[in-house]
Swiss-Prot record:
Component of the cuticle of migratory locust which contains more than 100 different structural proteins. Sequence repeats lie at residues 7-10, 13-17. Keywords: Cuticle, Repeat. It comes from Locusta migratoria (Migratory locust). The tetrapeptide (A-A-P-[AV]) repeats found throughout the protein are also present in many proteins constituting the protective envelope of other species. GO terms for molecular function: structural constituent of cuticle. The keyword Repeat applies. This is Cuticle protein 54. The keyword Repeat applies.
Amino acid sequence: GYLGGYAAPAIAAAPAIAALPAASSIAANGY
């Protein structure tokens, strides 16, 4: 994990745009 505050908006937006941004956010943040 990198920053919860940074991941939260990405995770919140992920379902609207699909799994692509979710996977990118997870990879970028180390989750």
